[in-house]
Amino acid sequence: MYLETRRAIFVFWIFLQVQGTKDISINIYHSETKDIDNPPRNETTESTEKMYKMSTMRRIFDLAKHRTKRSAFFPTGVKVCPQESMKQILDSLQAYYRLRVCQEAVWEAYRIFLDRIPDTGEYQDWVSICQQETFCLFDIGKNFSNSQEHLDLLQQRIKQRSFPDRKDEISAEKTLGEPGETIVISTDVANVSLGPFPLTPDDTLLNEILDNTLNDTKMPTTERETEFAVLEEQRVELSVSLVNQKFKAELADSQSPYYQELAGKSQLQMQKIFKKLPGFKKIHVLGFRPKKEKDGSSSTEMQLTAIFKRHSAEAKSPASDLLSFDSNKIESEEVYHGTMEEDKQPEIYLTATDLKRLISKALEEEQSLDVGTIQFTDEIAGSLPAFGPDTQSELPTSFAVITEDATLSPELPPVEPQLETVDGAEHGLPDTSWSPPAMASTSLSEAPPFFMASSIFSLTDQGTTDTMATDQTMLVPGLTIPTSDYSAISQLALGISHPPASSDDSRSSAGGEDMVRHLDEMDLSDTPAPSEVPELSEYVSVPDHFLEDTTPVSALQYITTSSMTIAPKGRELVVFFSLRVANMAFSNDLFNKSSLEYRALEQQFTQLLVPYLRSNLTGFKQLEILNFRNGSVIVNSKMKFAKSVPYNLTKAVHGVLEDFRSAAAQQLHLEIDSYSLNIEPADQADPCKFLACGEFAQCVKNERTEEAECRCKPGYDSQGSLDGLEPGLCGPGTKECEVLQGKGAPCRLPDHSENQAYKTSVKKFQNQQNNKVISKRNSELLTVEYEEFNHQDWEGN
């Protein structure tokens, strides 16, 4: 059936073709004979009859031949119609070219001269003016450069740089005086400090302004020398940990070949990196010391001192004062002895914050160095003496001997100005004369609180080699002493003697161990050790008026450095911390420590935290959950450590808790707020803040344990927590508290039976304790008698 249908269609198509051929032949015949046989008046009638004889398919083919062609698009986006002539096409292309050029010219003029994005209206106006050829392209640039907005902006940026006695200030009246007058600006504008990042020689600044004047205006050499004669040097000290470099004993000796080799290699590598920074002069390797990473591996920490140039009247950070020129090139020309040096970079003077940010970025981006952590110490930003040529590759001080990065206690801020570092090579000092200065033993408060590696120098006259300091002592960093306890440990603080610089380095490196041993041998506290026998009466008898706002204060401070934390003799290191679990709902049962919910949550946090703390913190001993508070769930806790730990306690605990927070969020779905982490060592913390005693309780110091505890005010007592007490529910003689739904733990008056039961339980506990003591004493007596009997029996035999 399908084949028959196709065959029928094919036959019909052939028939149409044959019929059309016949019609064409008839038309040709009639066209040849119409002028002879027929008069003109019958022409219209015959043509109409012939049109009707033509087939429908033929008319379709004829219409297809005369169909209009599609319009062609050029790659530029210009539409060219087939009906247009060549002249019209060229005019369209030129109009499109003029539009695009004007759009780009106006946009770049706003960006370069006015440093802003134009409004739609003013942008269209300038594009229309450009298309009408009212101004040529360069006239538009001159218009923008001579505008008052551009001149005000340029004056503002130039005045933000501090150049003493500038002679090239531009006045608006002079600039706008004559329409055809060329703007003249000194070439020193090219030397304006542009920003915190180093500028490459390919950059250009204000091309249109400086291009015509750089070759004509030259600043005299004497002027430049006077302008930049007073230069100061800025010193930045930092410590860099080398992850893949294990510490060796030879690095403790600055004269060993291995030390010299590693110091020279490190100095060359650092010079290549620091040369990219603006104003860099030189760098010194101060020394090396061992460092223990978080994963337990050992590495080497290197201390460096980098020296940069800076202007005497250092301005604020220039990062916010810049024009954003994007891809616009900035030319940098230097006028030196009357000649132009285009390949020289302009000098840029940065603040200490800018330098630290640039140094960190440069070291982190350097792939050839395996840099772990970068830590900046206090930099000495004062004016330094004008040194001669740099003859030493590194300072002769052994970094392993000196403890740096000392953590200061808030009670004793540094009030003395820091000492400047004096290069021993410039004063003719030998390597063995590098020693700390002698300290006057008058008062601890009058002495500088600590010394760092960069602030130690020899007390010598210039040109001499013998040192004056023979009895040298060094203060313990971070030691803060109240006035009442000064007499007890004044000898300790001034008795740690620094060995002479000419002695063996092994004796110097053992200074930290001697300090710890000396502290262990000497009891810094006059308070007796806690008794081993438990007592029922835990609270000190304090008058009522003394209970108001009583905050226990630690008698002695911890000795804290970057490498160790030491507690006073007879005590343990204690750290308070709190954290907030955001995705956990608070319940009123968490007010009461005897409730099942409190115990379950306490056990949960203990099981989570204790293994994590024990595996990550050396010397960890005990974790105590103090309480839970409302605010989602706030967990207040206390940790106890050994008497000394080999790290900075506060920083280490903070780092471990941050890691725990991340692990808990990923594995346990506990959302611990990072901003809620509050870590305070016991020597600086207010323990009452973490205890959160409540409205009807008072934070006092326990005489037996010497720790802060919550004590009820007169008429109140508690089995658990007193937070959320309501006034009026308790009175004198109150002994117990109960938890009410939605009200926390308000006190209530106990009845006689309850009070009797309470007294009975107390007596029962006392009897149990007495029985234990009696049974222990009896067992000891029996043991002694048995030994005496055996001895007599042996002698008798």
From Swiss-Prot:
Mutagenesis / variant outcome for changing L613P: In RP91; uncertain significance
Glycosylated residues: list them.
N42, N143, N191, N215, T403, T421, T432, T442, N592, N616, N630, N648
* SUPFAM superfamilies, sorted: SEA domain (SSF82671)
Query: What is this protein's name?
Result: Interphotoreceptor matrix proteoglycan 1
**Alphabetically ordered keywords of this record:** Cell projection, Disease variant, Extracellular matrix, Glycoprotein, Heparin-binding, Hyaluronic acid, Receptor, Repeat, Retinitis pigmentosa, Secreted, Sialic acid, Signal
Q: Entry's Pfam families?
A: SEA
One example of a Gene Ontology biological process annotation:
extracellular matrix organization
Q: What post-translational changes are documented for it? A: The N-terminus is blocked. Highly glycosylated (N- and O-linked carbohydrates and sialic acid).
Question: May I ask which residue range the UniProt record assigns to the signal sequence?
Answer: 1-20
**Source organism of this protein record:** Homo sapiens (Human)
Q: Which residues form the SEA domain?
A: 232-354, 571-684
Gene name of this polypeptide: IMPG1
